[in-house]
């Protein structure tokens, strides 16, 4: 016997198979193999733990209210973390859910934030106003163009051009 498992599994999706153990007096963390799951494990488990062990405050998180552009279904029983693309439309912030899945790494680079679906909920409704934790500065949200409708390959070309500007704009299409 090498040690003991302190906790295995958290009620979050992605990120469920996270692990903390004591191995010969040392704290050992086990992160899931899928990249998005590993990121959730770090943000929800390891970052607060490292802050606590180092006697420091956890990094400040910016939370804003966003209006969802579409319904986001979910299964009850786990808190789901959904990456969202956020942009300003008029005087409000709107959030479009991105693809889901523990291995969907492109959503991490395309997202400006995360929305949490509580573990007792079966999802969130279109037009619901919910908190979103930003992964970018709030000022960056004003440099995102939001496009709603069917996707066209021309939009990908436009997005590339906008990112190549001296002061880049992000392009978020739904």
Regions found by a protein language model. Name each.
Residues 2-137:
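Flexible glycine/proline-rich
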Residues 137-174:
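Domain-level signature for soluble enzymes in the chorismate/prephenate branch of the shikimate pathway
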């Amino acid at each position: 016997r090498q040690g003991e498992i302190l906790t295995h599994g958290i009620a979050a999706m992605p990120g469920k198979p996270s692990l903390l153990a004591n191995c010969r007096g040392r704290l050992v963390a086990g992160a899931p193999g899928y990249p998005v799951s590993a990121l959730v494990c770090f943000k929800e488990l390891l970052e607060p733990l490292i802050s606590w062990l180092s006697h420091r405050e956890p990094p400040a998180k910016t939370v804003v209210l966003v209006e969802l552009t579409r319904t986001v279904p979910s299964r009850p029983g786990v808190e789901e973390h959904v990456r969202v693309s956020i942009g300003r439309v008029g005087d409000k912030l709107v959030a479009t859910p991105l693809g889901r899945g523990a291995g969907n790494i492109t959503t991490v680079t395309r997202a400006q934030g995360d929305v949490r679906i509580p573990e007792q909920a079966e999802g969130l409704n279109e037009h619901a106003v919910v908190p979103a934790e930003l992964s970018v500065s709030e000022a960056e949200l004003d440099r995102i163009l939001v496009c709603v409708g069917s996707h066209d390959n021309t939009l990908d070309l436009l997005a590339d051009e906008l990112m190549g500007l001296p002061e880049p704009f992000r392009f978020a299409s739904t």
